[in-house]
């Protein structure tokens, strides 16, 4: 195993293997920063905990807030590093597993060049072969001047419902951290099938820098591949939609709708249409990245969090600027 003190190579794709609990949660953001700084294109973050056992269906929704906090902590930490080095296309993926064997199942279709672990933690045999480098990261990482609170396991009270079929929607252009938080949470509560509606190309003609929008075939493939990696035990129906409703307008099997706080208004429109068509109501799950992240991230303020550049619009603007500078 190589130590950071002796060598600082750059790897195309790296994998961070991290045992997650309340104590280690305060070090996660800085550990992610160190791993990304040794990675060129992509970092796969494997977080391990017995609490991530998603086969216990009755506990999935009760852990909603805690799981959301974990994903926000990891993804926004990664987004800030990508922003600092002006690389919004750097790809970060987070998976939640109970052990290394389950991680290997989730990552069966993925490839990586190096495995990062904390000092004293051996790289798991299930994720390492002769072609991989293994790198040891400092076990106690703190960022000067930051306040990061431990993430305690908090569960929701009340009836623990099981959702066989859930739905969510969006453009999902250049699948970024914000998208992945939304999709991951939808997959987390789902036990059988996740429907992901993607705005068809015809709906995006008024978007800024529309020439850089990925075609619908690319976007649907990216979503399906991400769900397969995050939770391979469920089906993913990634489908093009021509309106804000998609399959929720006619599919009676949908039990839950997952939205962001920015698209909450559209959820009420969908609920009204289903009522008019005598379709079963859907339970609503809302993700609020800003309010959640302020609990666990360094105290950079709401404005700084909004500037984390987790948007497809920003990525297209970045691509346009990059192309413009190359033409000069």
How should each PLM-predicted stretch be described?
Residues 1-328:
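Nucleotidyltransferase catalytic core that binds NTPs
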